Amino acid sequence: MTTFSAPEPDFAAKRKHLREHALKLRQALPVERREVMTGQLARHLDALMQTLAPRSLGFCWPYRAEPDLRDWVQAWLTGGSGRIAALPVVVERHAPMVFRRWIPGVPMALDRHGIPHPAEGEALVPEVLLVPLNAFDDRGYRLGYGGGYFDRTLAGMQTIAVGV
């Protein structure tokens, strides 16, 4: 039998410090630099999507200076028939998120952080999910905001997660 214990306080404090530091660095980037970097990311995503060829794609509304991929997602939607984009929705705290279909102009609501999401719609599971991150380590492990929403969501979802 395997038992798990809570991470040592040192580890949790280190992660919190790294999260805050990475977020400050990202937010300190000039808007023009972030736009250039988002364009570079979009070109990499173009190549990746040609390889993966998903019919459905989950992405996140930009939050706290994250890459703004909305224009890229709109272009991806128009690049092939039957494509679906989806945004995450926190239905219940400490539970996995659900994804609802997004198209430009769909009625939106704000979550408790002020992040827009589709106000209603059926839940779907995107084939590819663009997951925001603040940093990652040398093994590719993601450092997010610390709420565990994506960890819980990805644990129960069959999708290809791509850190952005």
Task: List the model feature ranges, each with a label.
Residues 139-164:
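Membrane-associated lipid acylation/remodeling enzymes share a hydrophobic transmembrane-juxtamembrane segment
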Residues 122-132, 136-140:
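Helix-hairpin-helix/helix-loop-helix acidic hairpins
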Residues 86, 130, 160-164:
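Hydrophobic/aromatic beta-strand patches that form the interior of the parallel beta-sheet core
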Residues 118, 132, 156:
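Mid-sequence acidic-hydrophobic segments that form the walls
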Residues 58, 129, 135, 144, ...:
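Conserved beta-strand segments that form the floor/walls of ligand-binding pockets within enzyme
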Residues 2-125:
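N-terminal active-site beta-alpha-beta segment that forms phosphate/nucleotide-binding
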Residues 104, 134, 158-159:
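Short loop segments at secondary-structure junctions
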